[in-house]
Amino acid sequence: MEITLKGRIPSKKNQKQIIYRNGKPLIISSKKHKEWHTEQMWMVKGKGKVEEVKNIDITLYAPDKRKGDLTNKAESIMDLLVDAGIIEDDNWMIVPNVFLRFGGVDKENPRAVITINKK
């Protein structure tokens, strides 16, 4: 199964905000990350579920030459796949191998290409 996510992939770890509930601080995902997550959920819903995953191959294409942390972006993608119901969980027993690579800069079409290979 191949899925393409359009646009810049936000880093989940660097997109946090602190709110206060009952006088206690609570760290939550930022509005920007939530908007991206919700938008992409609509794009990938209905793609089907992969029961037995051999590996997941993620290739990221950036819109510019700014430095970015690939593993943080991969975490956003893996959480999206779980929340959309495409994979059951992203732990190593369900997904034994994740291959992550930088595909280069594509100013016109930044994206993430995700290939999920079944056992």
Task: Tell where the protein language model's regions lie, with residue ranges.
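Acidic, proline/glycine-enriched N-terminal capping motif
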Residues: 1-119
